[in-house]
């Protein structure tokens, strides 16, 4: 069976030894980049082919002073259409997307077979809510990135009818 072959492959390889981190990163950006670096190493060394990373809890009170947002993320998401709150929310969302772009760049620069690790990967980045003010869970913005070893056509923006379930993406 395939699982038997996979087990034999794993036994035949030396596992890399990584040093344990010395402490908790001092900024959220450092933490996110560290998580993405570990994920890239795990993919590169084929320790795993699946991973998840949640940027924060659904009701996180995390503030982002490094980008000029002193209010908590969850509170800002209940913006009540206040332009200042909407601007702060846009800054947070942009900040998170920049961190995801860091990961994409990292994978793009790791050779893998006939391309890059990104060419042979499929990644999903998104959110569980489109309008926190209304607790609106429809029209969720999602990014699908990577080449999936030639099985994914990129460079497109797709918009579906309002009643299309997100599960259709999977």
Segments predicted by a language model, with ranges:
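Ligand-binding pockets and gating/stacking loops
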Residues: 3-170
């Amino acid at each position: 069976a395939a699982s038997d072959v996979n087990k034999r492959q794993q036994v035949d390889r030396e596992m890399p030894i990584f040093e344990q981190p010395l402490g908790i990163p001092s900024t959220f950006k450092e933490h996110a980049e560290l998580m993405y670096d570990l994920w890239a190493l795990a993919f590169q060394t084929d320790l795993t082919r699946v991973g998840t990373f949640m940027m924060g809890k659904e009701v996180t009170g995390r503030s982002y002073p490094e980008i000029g947002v002193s209010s908590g993320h969850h509170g800002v998401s209940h913006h009540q259409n206040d332009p200042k709150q909407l601007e702060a929310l846009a800054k947070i969302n942009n900040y998170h997307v920049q961190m995801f772009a860091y990961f994409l760049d990292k994978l793009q620069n790791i050779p893998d077979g006939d391309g890059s690790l990104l060419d042979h990967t499929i990644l999903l980045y998104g959110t569980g809510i489109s309008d926190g003010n209304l607790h609106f869970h429809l029209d969720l913005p999602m990014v699908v990135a990577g080449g999936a070893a030639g099985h994914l056509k990129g460079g497109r923006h797709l918009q579906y009818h309002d009643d299309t379930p997100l599960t259709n993406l999977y």
